[in-house]
């Protein structure tokens, strides 16, 4: 080929440049497998992250898919082959299970991001109907005869496990750490649960849309979202005297992301949750931000609560899971009426 001909040289150069640009452009697809009530948060966050990534790599095409359900159920789906690049679940035990049973990420995954890989927090509060007709003020009111309590199944829902442990922690504090009395209290509470929903969003739908129950035990973000969406004073938030600090964690599913070629983008996606923009998105979707400046800005949006922690009351999620939610554990004993 005679490249001394300027027009021919430019034509060849154009082909080379076009090929190089085409090679550089990537069609990226991420799957975020998340727990039940994070739909709105991640729809909002995904839009911001796509814009952020396009600013760095303008030729890339990025599509983020979401999967939602009860946290325990979602973890099992990933272990069984759902090819998540990222998991954003309700509690650390569920990601531990993916690491231990699925061998899809390292056991020390929590050390890879700040705050034990938990970019935002939440807690457990109550939602009651307008005027609070049953006079619900604290956990004790949930075990009274004739009070229908809506909470999902702890076997499938991460939020339900937080609900259960918050109630247990309250009973321990009230009764001088008497485990037998705590078990009796939680058993009474679950006797007042008329519907066995598998996830937090299903429980909210049962209470808010189907009109079943006198009180919903729920994630704080789910309650605040329900208040916003109803907009007419149809419901009220009740903050109990004691609740629990819920720390939903996030992780890259290494083996899947490596196979998909999405490791760098998946890592950047989770890191973006910790930026001021990511924290602001969490706050406006009613999750408590970790970043102090953003938390201070939104402090008025969240009730002040006395919060227990999973470590101080239950010595971490591994022990809580085995004692309370494993097959034959305390929750199963409560359900069957055994000791």
Regions found by a protein language model. Name each.
Residues 1-11:
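Bacterial N-terminal signal peptides that target proteins for export
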Residues 33-35, 128-130, 148-175, 190-193, ...:
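Short beta-strand->loop
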